[in-house]
């Protein structure tokens, strides 16, 4: 294995390109960026030196909406009507999921995210204690939420409350600054107002985040209005779920007033363009309204079964192109804003720092190959990163100063892939045996 | 260099996966698939053996609409209104293009296409004799058209006719079965009916293809109706340009009758989803109408300045997702049809064989990494290829039985990238000096 991956200590990235200039980046033992510039090397006595020539440094990417362990369901079923896909394919398989599956699937998802430049993610699923173990092993950051679904049933709600409290206690007990916990009320169509209210109060009391699906489909909006007399964002707001600690995924069918409401409450809207296109939700997130209102808009891949990958570099292209196409404006969401979405906006959402390459920020750093085909010619690095490259251009990934990948090598990759394949096969076998 | 790349002769791909079965593929000295199956190895005494374990074989991809040398303009200007982008950025730069630039840019484009699994492409640009030299050097197949633009001026038309005739004579003189020539009337808004008629007659006389842009924007349709009293497809038909040898790019704004007309004439419609989204053309190709009419629908990346890459694996995902989103149907353009678009439909369009892995077909073969993250788990290879993978999963590429890439190694890659970067820099410098 490359010794740069196994070494620990302070670190210097020498002669790397940032915004067209060649600089050094010094990272101290705590994993904080200590200096950036031509003289940065003088500020530390680096234990590790990474050659930054032919490399472009960008902040580590942040995936603000996924269901990581669903990597095991990649390609299991596609090209179906949403309801058939869920009821005939996804749910019957998920009924057989074990904690071991979630560990294998989350570890595999972390591998995929690291290989495409992601350092932190916002996750919602089940067996999240095992997801935490996987994140810990892989050295990434994550905010983990148990998917809270009460379907309006009090008994189920009590069980979900317990599951949520158990996860929060577990993650707190880990005392790992890279791993955070959030409350995960699934959506207004799967959680009762009572459940939503409990989630909001508990999140406030615990000072933790809220991770929720919002206005993914038109049906969600229509049903919500029919049932509660108000649109989903207003229902969430009534229940106290719209806070600066809230990440609302999808947000396709928000109207303009709801966009203003999200901005006023400090909510982050997570754009998930590939999933929205694949599932044909028939409307792209109104980014222009959210932007005009000053909302924080971040980027997410959604789970592997509705994307079908976790490559946030690719997702930036889908975001920038979908916004242009859906809202009929070739100038909407230019490359620089797409990168901001995938970095700083995500970091703000998850509270993992500024999400920029600045002194004092956590050293969450991605090095892209400046000699890659997709980076040639190199007129505008932002344009190439968004429109031409995918995760394959990512060469090195640092999270809090620790090297998770170097020259595309991630420790244990073969074993992680093999175990994910075995877990997926076993899951399908068990589901078929029982049917 | 890997000896499998330099070796010449008959070839065996041993133990490779096709449609879930493990088989051998035997390729004879002429580059034709001689046998496929468990006993294929017995049919030839192979000079070269490629280990197919952990590899999935698919037909080589065919890119049916691009402007290859525009790889030099990748990322030069983005996120602009189409007319500003062309008049302020692209055209001023193109005015300084030389034959050497086109050679460097096309060779670089070939490298990018090979690295993402493309074996053949349909090109339209200038200095196409130099493009032919690049294609020859790189071992790919291409159909080359000079972009014919008369703007209604007779003098210009005469010059375009001469340029077209010169290119046709040049390509014929090469006598290279991998390199074909076509007539390239740019579009109904840049070529007069007289010019279109000449193109159609000359193509018929020479028995060569026609490569044209069709109904990319609403403005094109509106202007055509105002000027000629008919929609673009009907104007092209009146001029004789709709033939089984015709590839019409974009086709976003076709109405249902035009889709039937294209099908009746045997025209191939080339879908270019990423370009259409990036330039915000406001309507996706009506694939459902073309499919219902029985038209041949293929896939293309368009040029690098409006995509911004030539990765047809990525383009399959854009096609499958854009169709679902734009026409509000999660079942439209399933994975298998996206692969058909990128392989067999393209091969039919360019006359390069069936575009399938079948005995007697040219050995245009791509080997994908079955152990890649994007191919794990491997429930459905088609789904993974379209929705999860990009060109990075392509390990080996054969064109007419010749190995163009093996284990991601392409001969001369570093030099080709370096020369493209230098050519792009020099082009911009010359343009700036003259402004």
Model-derived features: positions:
Chain A
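Divalent metal-coordination and catalytic microenvironments
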Residues: 16, 31, 54, 65, ...
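Active-site gating loops and adjacent loop-to-helix segments of metal-dependent hydrolytic enzymes
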Residues: 72-104, 111, 138-153, 158, ...
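Histidine/acidic-residue-rich catalytic or RNA/ligand-binding cores of hydrolases
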Residues: 218-230, 258-263, 280-290, 307-324, ...
């Amino acid at each position: 294995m490359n010794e740069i991956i196994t070494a620990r200590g302070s670190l210097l990235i020498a002669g790397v390109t940032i915004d067209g200039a060649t600089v050094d980046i010094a990272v101290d033992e705590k994993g904080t960026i200590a200096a950036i510039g031509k003289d940065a090397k003088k500020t530390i006595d680096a234990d590790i030196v990474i050659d930054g020539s032919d490399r472009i440094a960008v902040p580590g990417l942040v995936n603000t909406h996924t269901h990581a362990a669903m990597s095991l369901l990649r390609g299991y079923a596609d090209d179906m009507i949403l309801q058939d896909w869920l009821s005939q394919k996804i749910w019957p398989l998920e009924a057989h999921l074990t904690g071991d599956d979630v560990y294998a699937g989350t570890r595999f998802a972390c591998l995929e995210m690291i290989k495409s430049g992601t350092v932190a993610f916002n996750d919602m699923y089940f067996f999240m204690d095992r997801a935490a173990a996987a994140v810990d092993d892989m050295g990434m950051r994550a905010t983990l939420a148990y998917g809270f679904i009460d379907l309006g049933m009090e008994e189920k709600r009590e069980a979900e409350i317990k599951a949520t409290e158990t996860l929060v206690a577990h993650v707190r007990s880990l005392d790992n600054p890279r791993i955070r916990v959030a409350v995960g009320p699934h959506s207004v169509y799967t959680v009762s107002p009572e459940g939503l209210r409990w989630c909001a109060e508990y999140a406030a009391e615990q000072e933790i985040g809220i991770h929720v699906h919002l206005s993914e489909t038109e049906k969600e909006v229509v049903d919500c209005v029919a049932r509660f007399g108000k649109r989903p964002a207003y229902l969430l707001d009534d229940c106290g779920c719209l806070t600066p600690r809230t990440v609302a995924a999808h947000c396709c069918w928000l109207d303009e007033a709801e966009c203003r409401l999200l901005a006023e409450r400090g909510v982050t809207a997570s754009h998930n363009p590939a999933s929205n296109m694949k599932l044909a939700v028939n409307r792209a997130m109104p980014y222009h309204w959210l932007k005009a209102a000053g909302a924080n808009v971040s980027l997410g891949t959604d789970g592997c079964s509705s994307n079908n990958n976790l490559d946030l570099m690719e997702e930036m292209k889908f975001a920038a192109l979908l916004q242009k196409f859906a809202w009929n404006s070739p100038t909407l969401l230019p490359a620089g804003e797409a990168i901001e979405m995938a970095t700083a906006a995500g970091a703000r959402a998850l509270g993992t720092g500024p999400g920029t390459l600045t002194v004092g920020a956590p050293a969450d750093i991605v090095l892209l190959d400046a000699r890659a085909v997709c980076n040639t010619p190199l007129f505008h690095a932002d344009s190439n990163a968004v429109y031409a490259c995918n995760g394959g251009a990512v060469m090195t990934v640092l999270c809090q100063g620790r090297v998770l990948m170097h020259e595309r090598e991630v420790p244990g990759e073969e074993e992680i892939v093999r175990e994910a394949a075995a877990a997926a096969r076993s899951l399908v076998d068990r589901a078929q045996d029982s049917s």
